[in-house]
């Protein structure tokens, strides 16, 4: 699925843009020109380097940019393909929310992937917990252990592939205003996968950089830190980053906190989903290929 998205995105690159595949071995920056050395020895000379390396630290460290941990091991996610089997409801997609705060499970999504379904589970479990450690070896049993109501929708499902595990730290960067280099997306600030803000944040970064700042920067000499600082101070970018941070805190608290405030918030969200689900079923029944959203 991810590979397909990448191929589609790369197909949009115009022929006038040179596309190079390689591993960056070194990077040197200055107020005027930047030099990127590929592992094979080729050198790319450019006015600006845009760093979109996700959680990778190697190039950031070469540039003297430090990562500041906000919340280590914030989210633990699992992904795997399943075959739905002959029974149960027929749906193109399903979101099933965790049943108890003690389980630490936010929600499960099921999306079509060829002849199978792609299951993604977003949790705030400790990776050392019994359930989390054992899940990769016996995913079906342990999934039904914490989501028994899922059997109503998928009574005969089978896990048909390897379970992938993803641990996400929440972090941001310091000392990042540097000559000739811009960090975007997770390279600047990571996002909670359960909150679903990573792509939207990245798109805001790209939109503001390409439409507002790059035309101005390239129209004048130099690429010093004073220019770069304007991008990081952009109000739209800062607002998107702040929304992502708040969403990460909200999803975790909504999932695992047990005090009265969050119990009431869970009930509110449950009633809202049930109401929207009822309306959706009246407009387009689930059995008629609607999209389901369930919390027991």
Task: Give the residues covered by each predicted segment.
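Conserved N-terminal helical subregion
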Residues: 1-62, 68-74, 78
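Well-ordered beta-strand positions
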Residues: 21, 28, 37, 43, ...
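Short beta-strand-initiation
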Residues: 31-33, 103-106, 169-171
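Beta-strand-connecting loop/turn residues
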Residues: 32-34, 115-116, 179-180
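Conserved FAD-binding catalytic core of PHBH/FMO-like flavoproteins
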Residues: 52-152
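Short coil/turn segments at secondary-structure boundaries
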Residues: 91, 155-158, 244-249
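FAD/FMN-dependent oxidoreductases across multiple families
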Residues: 127-219
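C-terminal helical "tail/cap" subdomain of flavin- and related membrane-associated enzymes
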Residues: 211-296
